[in-house]
């Protein structure tokens, strides 16, 4: 018995015999497999196949952001039909995201109704005095849910201590919280080492705790030095002392080459070390040339 999946084709070619009678050739029939109709293009997806002949199977897959609504494969039947019916690719959506405690929506735009599409994002922000732990942006995933939500926690910082030889100002309230600021300053002749303004961070600590550093009294009475690229008289520029962190370059003599060079000195919290090569010029030794007036090496 011949399968109904095979189609008969007759090749009725009549041949003329020598005796004048007509005869049918022996090989006149051919069977070929049934062919199912073209599966078409799967919108937002792909169809994987080799042929559409019985009993082949075709497969389906959707592009990122879409899911198969229906079967993942279909078979060509003896009747020349696909079974099960061909699927469609439906768009993945996420419901409105839950809002974390002590948080609010910063950026949120739905794609259809109240739902969001795959890879749509939502941005959260924390209420005042609450710090965010985790990513502020969540994304609609291929599974139809949102990536991990952030957490908003209340953060408090201790009252900042007043630095020695300085002062600090901060908001007059019982508790200092996340993002609150404090401003530091120093008394005269002292310089702030660190930022003037600091902030309460999410760790419960201040971003910095600056201190006040003392100025330096110079043992040198008169000298020409380099300060910030300019030649200055040390007795004029630093008559009240050098501030912490200030740098100057003293002129020194190279006796062998009869030329001058410079050595750096820096004031560090009330202390400055004068270069050993420096010799303070005496007005009594008027015949001697000051190192600052000697040709550079």
From Swiss-Prot:
Coiled coil: none annotated. Residues 1-19 form the signal peptide. Gene3D superfamilies: Complement Module, domain 1. One of its GO terms (biological process) is response to triglyceride. Disulfide bonds join 36-76, 62-89, 94-140, 126-152, 157-200, 186-212, 216-267, 252-277, 259-297. It holds the Pfam family Sushi. It is found in: Secreted. One of its GO terms (cellular component) is high-density lipoprotein particle. GO terms for molecular function: heparin binding; identical protein binding; lipid binding; lipoprotein lipase activator activity; phospholipid binding. InterPro entries: Compl-Cell_Adhes-Reg, Sushi/SCR/CCP_sf, Sushi_2, Sushi_SCR_CCP_dom. Keywords: Disulfide bond, Glycoprotein, Heparin-binding, Repeat, Secreted, Signal, Sushi. Glycans are attached at residues 69, 114, 135, 145, 205. Residues 20-32, 34-91, 92-154, 155-214 form the Sushi domain. Residues 215-297 are annotated as: Sushi-like. Expressed by the liver and secreted in plasma. It comes from the Eukaryota. Binds to various kinds of negatively charged substances such as heparin, phospholipids, and dextran sulfate. May prevent activation of the intrinsic blood coagulation cascade by binding to phospholipids on the surface of damaged cells. This is Beta-2-glycoprotein 1. The gene is Apoh.
